Amino acid sequence: MGVVRVQHETKMENQSWLKKLARRLGPGHIVNLCFIVVLLFSTLLTWREVVVLEDAYISSQRNHLENVANALDKHLQYNVDKLIFLRNGMREALVAPLDFTSLRNAVTEFEQHRDEHAWQIELNRRRTLPVNGVSDALVSEGNLLSRENESLDNEITAALEVGYLLRLAHNSSSMVEQAMYVSRAGFYVSTQPTLFTRNVPTRYYGYVTQPWFIGHSQRENRHRAVRWFTSQPEHASNTEPQVTVSVPVDSNNYWYGVLGMSIPVRTMQQFLRNAIDKNLDGEYQLYDSKLRFLTSSNPDHPTGNIFDPRELALLAQAMEHDTRGGIRMNSRYVSWERLDHFDGVLVRVHTLSEGVRGDFGSISIALTLLWALFTTMLLISWYVIRRMVSNMYVLQSSLQWQAWHDTLTRLYNRGALFEKARPLAKLCQTHQHPFSVIQVDLDHFKAINDRFGHQAGDRVLSHAAGLISSSLRAQDVAGRVGGEEFCVILPGASLTQAAEVAERIRLKLNEKEMLIAKSTTIRISASLGVSSSEETGDYDFEQLQSLADRRLYLAKQAGRNRVCASDNA
């Protein structure tokens, strides 16, 4: 029996919990939950589309940058390959010079003029380039300069041979403005002619003091590799910056000089403008290895820089980990790629306004508008359905209340009272608690109706119902079961306690006068019958009500306005 009792208590608690949950999760909450789930899923789907679109945008930016970077790299690679070819030719000429009379005469002429402040050796202006040089005294003043080598004559003839190759290799369509060989022995060969001999020393010292020459000493360039430098030109009158690619010329572990090609940044800018697609937005910028701005494809920023120091630091930090990539800076997307044949990096800057005007911007705007439209329609639908459900719920609650209550007394009607009474009686029986019933009948109610009218009778019923309700405990249930008859259910109350409640009801009804008409008051009374499961152990509500009703009539027969709690009253 103990196990059955525990199982029943657990079942009742579960049912109570489910009822509480059902009351809390009303139709309105369920509608809200459904719409929130739909809104979340639609937002997640839209967000997923945005992520895919962003990945496609980043890939597009990198592809555009890669196309321009490859084109620039190929052009620079062509110049580097020419430089390597010239160095190989120079090395061959140093080891095995051509045995031409004109070359031997050039060596003799060098010996004749080497002490002069400035000199120039020229074989054939139409076929080769002249060798321009300075005196032994001027060479001795330089730390990196020296004529103390056994192959000096071979270097002179090799320079003339390279001059021939330089003249053939140099053309106006190339990005290279000047190609030259500068020797540590005090002379140079350049595709840019020196019109006056008196300018040779100035130009030579302009060459040998440039970073692209000094940077090829054995200490600075141990691997003897091709290097790129950004510098000002050797001509004081020309202030345009330039990029120089250079390579050392060595033979038998001796450093003879440097072969170099100078590329003005304006030609690189023109190349960038020609390489990009005119239908695409975005600005291309070229930086050297130290992130110093060289040039831009945007004519509005030919010498400017749109990055502040903080942004340059962020860009440099990102470039430390990869050779290509992208980063967002405020309303700009910056992608970069290091060039293979240039010691620098090409950067593409795409602003938000440019992105909005492009294809991805149009798709993004359309996607945003669709999401906003769907969300607006969803919110409107939620509001309409929520109002409808709320109104229906209020109407349902009102109808349910009317179905369960007496509209006049606002107590439970007969059917609802019986529905409430049965489970309460069963619960009391399960826990072996007493279960009591009080039957109430107003005395002389028909006379009040006949004398003062039904309106007054209704007021009496409403007044009596209010007094009965105020006399009950929180767990007690009252209802109207007939015209002037009321029934009170007292779960857990013994017969004595129920009789006390009944007496309290009787006193409240009898001690207060009520106004039923102008200057007319009456005092009402009631007869009450009380029954309890304690008497017979019977928890059947209908039997207990019948017993209480019989005792009520005993109270009426005994003179009315009294409580009868036994058959012997």
From Swiss-Prot:
It comes from the Bacteria. The keyword GTP-binding applies. Coiled coil: none annotated. It catalyses: 2 GTP = 3',3'-c-di-GMP + 2 diphosphate. It is found in: Cell inner membrane. Keywords: Cell inner membrane, Cell membrane, Cellulose biosynthesis, GTP-binding, Magnesium, Membrane, Metal-binding, Nucleotide-binding, Transferase, Transmembrane, Transmembrane helix. It is a multi-pass membrane protein. It holds the Pfam family GGDEF. It is an enzyme of class 2 (transferase). GO terms for cellular component: plasma membrane. Pathway: Glycan metabolism; bacterial cellulose biosynthesis; Purine metabolism; 3',5'-cyclic di-GMP biosynthesis. GO terms for biological process: cell adhesion involved in single-species biofilm formation; cellulose biosynthetic process; negative regulation of bacterial-type flagellum-dependent cell motility. GO terms for molecular function: diguanylate cyclase activity; GTP binding; metal ion binding. The record marks K446 as: Transition state stabilizer. Residues 433-568 form the GGDEF domain. Binds 1 Mg(2+) ion per monomer. SMART domains: GGDEF. InterPro entries: CHASE7, Diguanylate_Cyclase, GGDEF_dom, Nucleotide_cyclase, Rev_trsase/Diguanyl_cyclase. Substrate binds at N449, H454, D458. Catalyzes the synthesis of cyclic-di-GMP (c-di-GMP) via the condensation of 2 GTP molecules. Cyclic-di-GMP is a second messenger which controls cell surface-associated traits in bacteria. Involved in the regulation of cellulose production. Homodimer. This is Probable diguanylate cyclase DgcQ. It comes from Escherichia coli (strain UTI89 / UPEC).
